[in-house]
Amino acid sequence: MGKPTGFIEYLRELPVDRAPLQRLGDWKEFHPHLEEKRLRQQGARCMDCGVPFCHTGKLISGMASGCPIHNVIPEWNDLVYRGLWREALDRLHMTNNFPEFTGRVCPAPCEAACTLNVNDDAVGIKSIEHAIIDRAWAEGWVTPQPPRTQTGRKVAVVGSGPAGLAA
């Protein structure tokens, strides 16, 4: 997984948020992506820990730890490090049908649970996830899937979480 010495060689890097006054004039992302080389370095920081708590999605002493939808984070970090973006998307879609939504609203408990976070700064998992799905849309790997036929039926959706978005 990743580069065995990646967590030693590379520091945690996160994109710099756009200034609020700059964001007022448009609907563009306020968390821009790192360039590909730097994203791959962040993927290399994933250290193939023995027990990757980042994707456990467990409650420990009543507190959430790791990814609540059990994304296989070390695997797609490794694929990004190796430049295998399409495969990283496939791995991400194994557990998450809506990374373009959930990845943006998630508070990233995976980063808090990252084993590297014990003695150093955690891997920038959230920024890697954003880059995977945004690249997938840009490359045409993800396309809208409208219903094949209209049934004429109506559905009431309660809530705006992942289940509501899937309805």
Which functions belong to the PLM regions below?
Residues 1-154:
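Ferredoxin-type iron-sulfur electron-transfer modules and their immediate structural context
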